[in-house]
Amino acid sequence: MADSLITLMIDGVPVSVAPGTLVIEAAKQAGVLVPHYCYHPGLPVAGVCRMCLVEIEKAPKLQIACATAVTEGMVVKTQSAPAKDARKSVLEFLLINHPLDCPICDQAGEGELQDFVFQEGRSGTRYGEYAKRFNPVEDFGPDVLYVPNRCILCTRCVRFMDDVAQEPVLNVSERGDRAFIGIHPEARLDHPWAGNVVDLCPVGSLLSKDFLHKARAWELDKTASICTGCSQGCSITLDTRDEVVVRVRPRPNLDVNRYFICDHGRANYRWMNRGDRIEAPLVKRDGELHATDWDEAFARVLGILRGASGKAVALVSAGASVEALSLAKRLLSTFQWTGAFQVVMGEEAPLAGVPNLALRAERAPNAKGAEQLGYTRDYAAAVKAAESAAVVLVLDDPDCPVQTAGALIYAGTVLPPETACRAAQVVLPIANVAEEEGTFVNRDGRAQQYFQAKPAPGMARPAAWVLGELAAALGVAEVA
């Protein structure tokens, strides 16, 4: 493998990369970030912004790092005087028309133009305010606004819709200093993956209506997580402000979702902030549920489990973590247990330009993990079996239509409706996916970890902690 690598020097640092690697990517391995706007590793190369100009020894002129492949023995200088002067000039041209509205721009603190102006740009401009443009904001789609005054025509959005989404509704209209991003007059940016143009935009020209004016970038806490919208298992970042999830963004994962997420997953966070959460354990007294502490709730559950025998049924959510599902199985291991999960189905929406990436019809982030642990998809049969079971455990499935002659234990984030699990003897408050650490297994069998982004409300705890404490107190051994 090492024999097939190409070795070059970038700012005096030797780097070995695979043949065909672009200079801009090789520079990253040397710890050098070459400024760029039009280039994105998930899009076809355009080479239109000219911001990534570097000096290459023996080349007759400066080269763009985003479209130049490495060669053996190449010597690249990203910080030479000619390269830096050229990038300063490019930035000066880009800023001729760009408005100075960083204080009101939603992308302030995250804008690549802002970053590279500080890193590479001149301290002043030779052009007056007369050069600024004043064009109205356009409504491109259900969640996308276009602010043409900020656009630098990097064409990332056009290339995404053309080559990745393969729905060519955007274009560069007009020419020269009158050019702007246009949309087909009869089209809307309503493709199931259209929200990615907002993530791709380096200057705050394309904005999400959902996130508009919600927070500044420096106010956000960012946490690595896994999307719960379907069984694809896309890597995401949860952005929280004051312990409230305000935005979901894609996190690069070349094996699962590359650099993108669908709009369904992007909007799949509001339930994480629900205000009707269960904040304390509840136990049934005189036919009514009453708040209590964990000690009494655990004592009630342990009394039920120790006093029962025969069949037990676990009706679980396919959004529960591997850890929680494993501990639920362990907790019921002394019974003849049956476990099942329900899968909500929806419409599948593939991203045409990326193989094996789609919003899956199966809206179940951990269905594969549940199956690997012995839970089945025959939910109706399990609900039927629950009617005669000694113990029924419902895990985060508030709409479960269970009726049982035995004892019902419900662990969930919200209270079930009157027609579902209100017959429970004990209700255990648990954290949702944004409030715990855990593991999901996606449809391809890939186990992926997610992390806690905010605290759980009140006395709610992660399901794995609750079930683990009960299993330990019951003295049941781990099960395979």
Q: For each of these PLM feature ranges, what is it?
A:
Residues 2-11, 19, 25-26, 30, ...:
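Residues forming the flavin
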Residues 8-9, 72-79, 182-185, 222, ...:
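Short beta-alpha connecting loops at secondary-structure transitions
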Residues 21-25, 321, 462:
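Short, structural beta-strand-to-alpha-helix junction motif
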Residues 23-57:
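A basic, amphipathic helix-loop patch mediating RNA/tRNA/ribosome contacts
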Residues 50-228, 232-236, 241-245:
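Fe-S ferredoxin-like electron-transfer domains
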Residues 128, 136, 241-310, 355, ...:
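Cofactor-/ligand-binding subdomain signature composed of acidic, glycine-rich
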Residues 307-308, 331, 335-480:
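Non-catalytic alpha/beta scaffold blocks inside enzyme catalytic domains
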Residues 313-324, 398-400:
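Gly/Ser/Thr-rich loops at beta-strand to alpha-helix junctions
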